[in-house]
Design a protein with these regions (language model features):
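Short, basic/polar, glycine-containing "phosphate-handling" surface segments that engage DNA
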Residues: 1-8, 61, 65-225
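Generic detector of bulky aromatic hydrophobic side chains
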Residues: 21, 28, 33, 56-58, ...
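Residue-level signal for functionally critical sites in structured catalytic/ligand-binding pockets
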Residues: 13-14, 34-35, 54-55, 64-67, ...
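Charged, often low-complexity linker/regulatory segments
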Residues: 1-28
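Active-site metal-binding core of divalent-cation-utilizing nuclease and nuclease-like domains
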Residues: 24, 28-59
Length: 225
């Protein structure tokens, strides 16, 4: 195993990209993903501009490719693209600009699909365990990865906003359906409570309760949490 022959502490970035990540991305339709210019990607303008050392960019989708031995949630001192926690780096980039809405972050072990989360208090992402997926031949997991992370899901037509990609359209539709489902569920719960409450009060054993409700001794709020 080539990874085992690397010196201790080697991030294995080049090996991981060439021998593994490039193959996974090719299977997902990205082909050879172009590297970003020196310094990475820039968010903001003028004095507010800030550079983010993200390694690659496919269309409007940053794809930060790191080595097998790089932790995605912790900084790796002295390593380009990981001098601060890679996940936090990519998330901040998405949050600071409208140029990118979705991004991919991977070290070969796992692949994360991130989205701009300025309206949320935490991170918004989906993670795929590539190591377990391929070692365990988990075809259903790969099918899900293919469904969500294929290049056609994040592809943006020339001159269009990142929000026009299929992945964002699906997200918008899912949110709308979820709101409608909650509205229907709320109405159903209210109807069920009214039916149960009416039946409870009409039961012959509850004559005393009906009388106490009628004369105000017991209020509806006393029996409804």
């Amino acid at each position: 195993d080539e990874l085992d022959r690397l010196p201790e502490g080697d991030a294995a970035t080049g090996l991981t990209r060439e021998r593994w990540i490039s193959l996974v991305l090719a299977d997902l339709g990205y082909g050879r993903v172009p590297p970003t210019p020196a310094g990475g990607l820039v968010a903001g303008e003028g004095a507010a501009a800030k550079s983010y050392p993200v390694s690659h960019l496919w269309g409007a989708t940053p794809i930060h490719q790191l080595g097998w031995n790089v932790d995605l949630d912790r900084r790796t001192r002295g390593l380009a693209g990981a001098a601060r926690a890679p996940h936090a780096l990519v998330q901040e980039l998405l949050n600071r600009t409208d140029d990118y809405l979705w991004a991919i972050l991977t070290n070969g072990r796992s692949l994360r699909l991130l989205r701009d989360s300025t309206t949320l208090t935490g991170f918004a992402y989906v993670e795929f365990d590539l190591e377990a997926m391929f070692d365990g031949e988990l075809y259903s997991e790969f099918a899900l990865l293919y469904l969500l992370a294929h290049q056609s899901r994040v592809e943006v037509a020339e001159g269009q906003a990142p929000s026009t990609c299929w992945l964002e359209r699906w997200r918008t539709t899912a949110i709308g359906q979820g709101v409608r489902a909650l509205t229907l569920l709320r109405a159903g719960v209210e109807s069920a409570l009214e039916t149960l409450g009416t039946g409870f009060l009409q039961h012959p054993a509850n004559v005393d309760l009906r009388q106490r409700l009628a004369d105000g001794t017991v209020r509806p709020t006393d029996v409804h949490a």
